[in-house]
C-alpha cells in the first residue's frame, strides 16, 4: 500500500488542478475582461453571434445604462392571457450595463388560484426564485438512475420563501392562493434564455416538429397533435 501512495497523491493532485481549471467554465457566462462593458446596441450588425454585446465607449456610459424601473410595476395577468401569468425580464436586452456581468433578474406575476408559468427551462442559467407575495406551488423534473425515468421535485413556497431551479431543468410555478402572487427571480446569466416546453413542441418551432414524431412520443393519434398545434400561434 505504501508504494501506491505517491501515485494516489499524484492522481488526486492532478484531479484538483483539473477541477480548478474547469471551475470558470462552469459559470453561467464567461468571465468579464474589464470593469464594465455596457452593451452598445446601435453598433450591432445582424443577429448576435457571441456571448455578449459590443462595448459602448466608456465616455458615453451613463447611470441610465445600469437602471431599469420595470420590476416595480405589476403586469396584466388577465386580459387575453390563458396562462394567468406574465414575466417582466430585466436582462441585458433591457439593461445594457449587465453586459458581461453574468447576472439578470425577472418579475413574475400570477393570477390567483391557478395562474401558472408553464413548464419551461433556462438553458444558460440556474434560477433562484423569491416569493414576494402570495403562495406558489413550484417544481422541477430531474432524471433518475432508472432508464427513461424522471422525478418531480415539488413543494409549496409561501411568501418570503426561496426556491432554486437547477440550470437547464424543466420547471414550473403555479399560484395556489386566493390572492395574486408575485415572484422575483435571479439568474447567473445576463441572458438566461427561456424555452417553454409546450410552445417549443407544438407552437413556435420553425419548421414545426413533425406531427408523426409528436404522436409517437406522446402515444396519441396524429389528430390529437394537430388539435393541440391549432391552439398555438405559430411564429
Swiss-Prot record:
Residues binding Mn(2+): 120, 122, 127, 171
Subcellular location: Secreted, Extracellular space, Apoplast
Signal sequence annotation: 1-27
Biological-process GO terms, alphabetical: plasmodesmata-mediated intercellular transport; regulation of root development
Positions bearing carbohydrate: 60
Keywords: Apoplast, Disulfide bond, Glycoprotein, Manganese, Metal-binding, Secreted, Signal
InterPro entries in the cross-refs: Cupin_1 (IPR006045), Germin (IPR001929), Germin_Mn-BS (IPR019780), RmlC-like_jellyroll (IPR014710), RmlC_Cupin_sf (IPR011051)
GO cellular component terms listed in the entry, alphabetical order: apoplast; plasmodesma
UniProt cross-references to CDD domains, sorted A to Z: cupin_OxOx
GO MF annotations, alphabetized: manganese ion binding
UniProt subunit comment: Oligomer (believed to be a pentamer but probably hexamer).
Name of this chain's protein: Germin-like protein 1-4
Taxonomic source organism: Oryza sativa subsp. japonica (Rice)
